[in-house]
């Protein structure tokens, strides 16, 4: 399973590194996801949740 936020749907983004000579190489920007237990349909479940979703109170740990 991909490391994608269960609540917000955030996923890693891709782009390029650019050197001083403007050469480009592919890179990815990861997201800060934590594996936490939350209630899903009334039952506890371990899912990947972004740190921002946890801080903003969109989800509550069990």
Curated annotation (Swiss-Prot):
GO terms for cellular component: ribonucleoprotein complex; ribosome. One of its GO terms (molecular function) is structural constituent of ribosome. Residues 11-20 have a biased composition (Polar residues). It comes from the Bacteria. Pfam families: Ribosomal_L28. InterPro entries: Bacterial_rp_bL28 (IPR050096), Ribosomal_bL28 (IPR026569), Ribosomal_bL28/bL31-like_sf (IPR034704), Ribosomal_bL28_bact-type (IPR001383), Ribosomal_bL28_sf (IPR037147). Keywords: Ribonucleoprotein, Ribosomal protein. GO terms for biological process: translation. Disulfide bonds: none annotated. Residues 1-26 are annotated as: Disordered. Belongs to the bacterial ribosomal protein bL28 family. NCBIfam families: L28. This is Large ribosomal subunit protein bL28. It comes from Exiguobacterium sibiricum (strain DSM 17290 / CCUG 55495 / CIP 109462 / JCM 13490 / 255-15).
